[in-house]
């Protein structure tokens, strides 16, 4: 167990003494059993006879992998992001013993049931904190530096409180707190001081991340050397929930191609195909660094830059902006598509008197409701796009990749893996780290283009 896991394990142990903590409520019988999903841990796959891939994963990435069937069993009743759920499963269920796994799943359910903050229960939790004087919560924490006071302040997403003083040790140790925030287990204390009414009565006693607080990309590269190319492809596909043994080589590469916008800056990708092929799943569920714009209705202010508030839009906040159902893309602003074309070409856009830059990739996914042969005879492969986009060659020329979605099979139960893969958060973070490395000249060794 590396230092990160030791800190987390120690953090969970420290919560045992806190009133309202995780350990305290373990005696309540109804927490785990009531309304919980029944699940058998005697899988048809014999995990005790570990494959070479699983053995290597346990050797080089222990604590960063999870059995994907466990995620499916809990996700149905847990209103938390997949990457948070898998991180907890990776800590409690990193074993091949069915009894240990069953106990670990019960622990994860208990932790979520007792400490996860639902937005509609925020005031109830705050009242409980005031009555008890201390309480433990699971929430997404973002830290900002208050320059005027020269102090760090935390903001709780679901709890709805901000400007909570936090020790500078935490943002120094877990830098992702400063970069969009991470999910944490936090011990809170409440003490109202009459003499200092301006001070916050809420204080952070201890904070323990339940996402990867940071990723060592060199450690990943060293571990990668132990795998063959085909083995690594299998690991990557299982990490996004797919079973490679049910896929043809071409289908594997097409599924991997969906990850390109998450790895490359300013990469424009389009995928059109039949329904039920999981076109938008990767951008919505797997990566916390991408956002799926459903319905297609948006504005220039929301997507690029709000001149009234002087704030950057989605392209400045996310690594990847995906549009679901391209047929419904509609800008309220007349110049919206032109600004989008400028951004897709150069990674920058002009608003007001200045030019702004961003690195978010653009993804367009949609459905084709007829056969490709008929589509080619009657219109084009970009027919699902609105006319002002699908017939504009300047817009189409800015696409770096077109994934033929009709070559990807419709997903059935056998296509989803029950085997080991990377925790979604770990996968997303090392993919994000790879965005900092440039491989644009990698082809020059083998090809000359143009």
Predicted features along the sequence, with ranges:
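Conserved ASCE/P-loop NTPase catalytic core
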Residues: 243-374, 379-383, 397
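Helical mechanochemical/support elements of P-loop NTPase systems and associated helical scaffolds
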Residues: 228, 232, 332, 336, ...
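Conserved NTP-handling cores and scaffolds of large molecular machines
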Residues: 240, 266, 290, 344-348, ...
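N-terminal acidic, proline/glycine-rich, low-complexity intrinsically disordered segments
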Residues: 1-31
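Extended, charged/polar low-complexity intrinsically disordered regions
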Residues: 32-239
